[in-house]
């Protein structure tokens, strides 16, 4: 039953990553002015899911998951490199955070939501959030 639960989780995560990617593509196709944040989210989430699913697949296959006779080991290596290509996931997270800060700073209630002691930090982040 545990393997069934892992397979279900793997399918759910893969489907969620797929739909986030579709949402990004749909925004771009519709001519959205800025898809930077959702593109970074899609890349980061989908590649994290790919590594998690590949890792779980290695676990499901047990010792065979590490053997080169089976494709699982290659899938894991391929998934891992996806987190590095076209900007590491850490860089993608910075892009996402800067866009979130930029969006938050454009709202009137920005100053009322950010405590005074953090205003300088967020103000500095706001200036560098021009992505």
Language model regions located:
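Alpha-helical interface subdomain recognition
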Residues: 1-131
């Amino acid at each position: 039953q545990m393997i069934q639960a892992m397979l279900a989780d793997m399918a759910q995560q893969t489907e969620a990553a797929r739909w986030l990617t579709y949402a990004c593509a749909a925004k771009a196709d519709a001519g959205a002015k800025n898809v930077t944040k959702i593109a970074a989210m899609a890349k980061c989430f989908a590649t994290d899911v790919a590594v998690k699913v590949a890792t779980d697949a290695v676990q499901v296959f047990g010792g065979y998951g590490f053997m080169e006779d089976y494709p699982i080991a290659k899938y894991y290596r391929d998934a891992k490199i996806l987190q590095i290509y076209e900007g590491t996931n850490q860089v993608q997270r910075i892009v996402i955070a800067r866009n979130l800060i930029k969006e938050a700073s454009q709202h009137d209630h920005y100053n009322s939501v950010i405590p005074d002691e953090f205003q300088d930090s967020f103000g500095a982040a706001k200036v560098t959030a021009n992505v």
